[in-house]
Amino acid sequence: MSSKIKGLLKARGPIKKIGVIGMGYVGIPAAVLFADAPEFDYVYGFQRDSKTSGYKIDMLNAGESPLKGEEPGLDELIKKVTGNAESDGDGKSSGKSVGRKKFECTSDFSRLSECDAITLAIQTPFKSREDLIPDFTPLIMGLRNAGRYLTPGTLVVLESTITPGTTEGMAREILEEESGLVAGVDFCLAHAPERVMVGRLLRNIREHDRIVGGIKSYGADGALPDGMDSPSTKRAMELYGPVLTKGELIPMSATAAEVTKTAENTFRDLQIAAANQLALYCEAMGINFYDVRRGVNSLKGEGITRAMLWPGAGVGGHCLTKDTYHLERGVKIVNTELGLNAGTKDSRMSPEPLDFPEGKESLYVLARQINDFMPHHMFTLTKSALRRAGKVLEGPENEIKIALLGWAFLANSDDARDTPAEIYYRLCKDAGADISIHDPHVLSYPGLDEGDTISQDFDGVIAGADVIAVLAGHKEYLTLKPEEVAKRVGVKCPVIVDGRNVIDPDMWIEAGFIYKGIGRGDKNVHRLILSGQHISKSPEMKS
């Protein structure tokens, strides 16, 4: 360890005060878990006081979570660490505040200068996926704020999913420029990617293994080892150790940590794409994907892994929809920069150029395209079902009403970031359909046409609907009774299109619905049942 950073960390002592920049799905649970750990004295949550998100400041300081949907334990923990919990010791309200206040949300970024450790949990979307151009604007703003108030011996950790090479590159440069300090010499810098899923945020942070990758430090003889021997890695492990209950710390280099996060999400996206493609094949062959899945997954034995995932109406969320492109961009950037840096203090063994089949598209990008296609397939199923009902979605005489159930991309959540429901909505709107949207958790969304809203009135949304399209697997949709829904819909030959495998096809077919479902080739062309009469399939009726 360089003598300077060693002395700075020794003088600073253990991490006691933490700043978390970004109060969203990642930053809020991380901040309150830090605050709940006895090893730490105080935590600041930093949030811009903007028109769109400034409301979070007052809510959090009042002990309220701005995140909707089901998040076990989060509401209670926020109340506890903000000093707003009320209990008489038996779990009953006494009207008295219990618990020491250890967390505060603020828009005053100058308080970063008080912190021993600063984490950044800020979204990193893409401006152009085709050209591999990310939108790092919010992250850059956060880094500039951190750098502006950075003091010697502070640890800075990027939790955001980022293009490999960002920590050692852009992040390091901005922090050094703003602070006048040198990373690895005057302050520590690491990447510790979040690995959370909405609906189980606290559990994921506590129980998942934590990847921790610090940058290199420099001594008199040049670069010192990175990975677990890096002082930045060791300091970051000190930060995350107290919040883990089952998870272990896994040290590595900063770039390896970046690749780990982008690769694990890319691989999951690839697995989902494999299930989606097989579901399309099963539809085309008139068989049930779920029978095939059960059969494939039944193969067990030493060294055998056949954990096929579920198909669906599309992949959403902030991570899987873009992390493939971070990985694709990263291999180009890191490979190039390592070659250019040969002979400098940053030099390592210059890598070979990427060797890949000429003219062939990345398997990962193709998988991403398949998953992006699935809401388009939902639209195709919708049109096909309407034709069986003698109705046409597209055309000048179109008066089709569609009830879209579930705007969130994830079941029982309010997270609608990059939701595939928006693609389906836009396709139907462009075809001239009238769309009503129901979601028990998502209250509003900025991308809707003027006059369109998201309602929590289920009966009002489905009334008069020619089509019910299920885009999210909320628990409220699992117990729907088809006979009751048919009465509320009140149209002849109602259609239901199941994009999340949440309903029993036979029950809905028996109730008179025309059914379509992803992967249900065995049911997508069924006998129509109208007023108790079975109507045989015919060439005109076949989808």
Language-model features, listed with the residues they occupy:
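Structural/interface elements that position substrates and couple domains in central-metabolism enzymes
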Residues: 1-543
